[in-house]
Amino acid sequence: MTEPDVDVARTFLDVLRTAAQTGDRSALYPLLADDVEWLTPQRDVEGIEAAQQELTWIKPPDTLELEFDEPNLSDLGGGHVVSDVHEVYRVKGTGEFAYARDRRIDLTIRDGKVARYEMRIVG
């Protein structure tokens, strides 16, 4: 395992989780490379400036609370780290289960920053 890459990935995923739960994305941007590629099924964003302007959807749902299981990280070498993430959505106020979703997050780490983020819904 390439420990520095895994450490960067783990820190990034922790910060991303906090951003998704609070809507505060400010701690996310310093972890991204200037030429970051951010790829999701809904849209693609390229470059740090575009990320700062367009990642506004990273926020908590209005009527749901979001929980994350601890990410399972796999170091594929060469700065490539993959994580399977399980999310549980609950109704705000009651805590009643709404739904769950599994995602695969594929990261490329370069010079201690996330150079590429690709998220796919897998379940």
Functional labels for PLM-detected ranges:
Residues 1-34:
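Short, low-complexity N-terminal intrinsically disordered segments enriched in polar/charged residues
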Residues 77-89:
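A short hydrophobic beta-strand element
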Residues 80, 100-123:
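Short beta-strand edge/turn micro-motifs at domain boundaries
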Residues 66-69, 98-104:
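Short, surface-exposed coil-to-beta transition loops
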Residues 39, 84, 117-118:
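Beta-strand residues in well-ordered beta-sheet regions across diverse protein folds
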Residues 25-30, 34-75:
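A solvent-exposed, acidic/Ser-Thr-rich amphipathic alpha-helical stretch
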Residues 9, 13-16, 32, 51-55, ...:
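Hydrophobic alpha-helical core bundles mediating ligand binding, dimerization, or RNAP-core interactions
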Residues 61-63, 89-99:
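Short, cysteine-centered beta-strand-loop-beta hairpins and adjacent loop/turn segments enriched
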